[in-house]
A protein has these predicted regions:
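Post-transcriptional modification and biogenesis factors for structured RNAs
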Residues: 1-192
Length: 192
């Protein structure tokens, strides 16, 4: 299971949308305090809709609390080179607009954690400089500061899931009123 970590999120609509994405992908959501809202806000529930009770939610007092509760993580302190794996330990990736490597440069493991910072400032620079080799970014045109947080989470999360074969996610869907045409006649690969 991929884990999404939000460091001090500020906007409830973003957190609600991210929570819904986590439910849709079978990913866990870890939130590091303080928040810029109350977790039971109507706005979060509205953005997360009826999925909020299904969120695999974990909360932490601060980043140190998060690290102490996850000693199994490879946080990137031991530099082994760009995009290399560190044995079998799940990695903690840090999404930032400042990183040298992109999210597509690295190999995500099936149990990795991907951390995103608050909307106004990102992940604190003290954390980024300590873990530079695990920092990743989404390429953007230079005229914009950053993408929306929930969009950034979705982009990187789905790349991590793609690299792991979309494990445990449905590969096809049913139409509401009609049926799909015969896949054999269309020369499409069979779906599971």
């Amino acid at each position: 299971m991929i884990h999404i970590v939000l460091h001090e999120p500020e906007i409830p609509f973003n957190t609600g949308a991210i929570a819904r994405t986590c439910v849709a992908t079978g990913s866990a959501l870890h939130i590091i305090k303080p928040y810029g809202f109350v977790i039971s806000d109507k706005m979060i529930r509205r953005a997360g809709m009826d999925y909020w009770p299904k969120v695999d939610l974990h909360e932490y007092v601060d980043f140190a609390d998060f690290l102490s509760q996850h000693p199994e993580l490879d946080t990137g302190r031991a530099l082994t080179g760009r995009g290399e794996t560190h044995g079998t330990k799940p990695k903690l990736w840090y999404a930032t607009t400042k990183a040298h490597q992109t999210y597509s440069d690295v190999t995500f493991g099936p149990d990795d954690y991907i951390m995103f910072g608050k909307e106004s400032a990102g992940i604190p620079e003290e954390i980024l400089t300590e873990h530079e080799e695990n920092c990743i970014r989404i390429p953007m045109w230079g005229e914009i500061r950053s993408l929306n947080l929930s969009n950034s989470v979705a982009i990187i999360l789905y790349e991590a899931l793609r690299q792991n074969g979309f494990e445990a996610l449905s590969q096809t869907g049913d139409l509401h009123r009609l049926h799909w045409r015969d896949e054999a006649a269309l020369h499409l690969p069979k779906r599971d």
